[in-house]
């Protein structure tokens, strides 16, 4: 039987409540958001429509069409609309706001659950249009107890491979594991998340910062030492800024030095 994280029960509880808020599953890439939603839907007793938005193809009109289909399911009682990868729909948050408010005025019990692989783009949409209309359900990196129970990780394996469930079966073949992590986690997180948060004038420097900084996980390293390993490209302010963006994207972050003053 597939392992179920705690957030599966949270999702189940929320979608079985009366319609109050849009539920949004948010978290770093490759942490099992879609899987958790699918597991929760297995025990959902009302009609539901589950769709996946596609980059470059799913338009605002497509989103409206899915919503109208779901409204038909809610004609005689509660129903649920699930939209995965909603960040691929241009201007998605304002479209969702309009449709959600229409349902509220009509007294329609259409519940809505949204997910997306880009936590940063989801958060951007929430800040723009949906204030007061949503609740977040966190999908964090997997903890050591979860990885130990689900995949048989030792503590050393967890510290080395991290809390990424999709990559866990590949850990015996480190080259294959690394290719997967680069293609599915690292590069998308840098290009589609971190670089979308703020202007990045030197994308290659950000990539180099990650590749140089990652081996220092859990260790002290100064910005000046990092700069030296980056061949003195950039400056400490740029490095600090890029590190913050990588942290917001959920792949690498730094701890500030403690100052009792």
Question: What kind of feature is each model-predicted range?
Answer:
Residues 49-77:
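Short glycine-rich substrate-engagement loop in P-loop NTPases that contacts/grips substrate
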Residues 178-261:
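Accessory nucleic acid-recognition modules appended to NTPase machines
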Residues 36, 40:
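Hydrophobic positions on the alpha1 helix immediately C-terminal to the Walker A/P-loop
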Residues 33:
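Conserved lysine of the Walker
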Residues 93-114:
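Conserved catalytic/switch belt of AAA+ P-loop NTPases
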Residues 25:
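Hydrophobic anchor at the beta1->P-loop junction of P-loop NTPases
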Residues 1-15:
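N-terminal pre-Walker A segment at the start of P-loop NTPase domains
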Residues 120-135, 151-152:
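Short regulatory helix/loop adjacent to the ATP-binding pocket of P-loop NTPases
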């Amino acid at each position: 039987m597939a392992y179920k994280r705690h957030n599966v029960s949270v999702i189940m509880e929320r979608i079985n409540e009366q319609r109050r808020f849009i539920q949004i599953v948010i978290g770093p890439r490759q942490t099992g958001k879609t899987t958790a939603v699918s597991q929760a839907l297995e025990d959902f007793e009302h009609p539901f429509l589950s769709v996946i938005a596609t980059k470059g193809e799913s338009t605002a009109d497509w989103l409206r069409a899915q919503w109208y289909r779901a409204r038909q399911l809610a004609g005689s009682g509660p129903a649920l609309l699930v939209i995965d990868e909603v960040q691929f729909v241009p201007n998605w948050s304002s479209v969702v706001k309009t449709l959600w408010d229409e349902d509220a005025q009509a007294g329609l019990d259409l519940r809505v659950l949204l997910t997306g692989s880009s936590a940063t783009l989801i958060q951007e949409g929430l800040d723009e249009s949906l204030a007061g209309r949503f609740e977040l359900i966190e999908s964090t990196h997997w903890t050591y107890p979860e990885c130990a129970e689900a995949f048989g990780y030792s503590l050393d394996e967890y510290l080395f491979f991290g809390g990424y469930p999709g990559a866990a079966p590949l850990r015996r073949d480190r080259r294959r594991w690394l290719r997967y992590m680069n293609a599915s986690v690292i590069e998308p997180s840098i290009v589609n998340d971190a670089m979308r948060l703020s202007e990045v004038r030197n994308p290659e420097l950000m990539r180099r910062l990650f590749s140089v900084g990652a081996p220092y996980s859990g260790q002290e390293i100064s910005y000046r030492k990092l700069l030296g390993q980056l061949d003195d490209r950039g400056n400490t302010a740029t490095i600090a800024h890029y590190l913050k963006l990588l942290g917001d994207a959920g792949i690498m972050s730094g701890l500030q030095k403690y100052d009792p003053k």
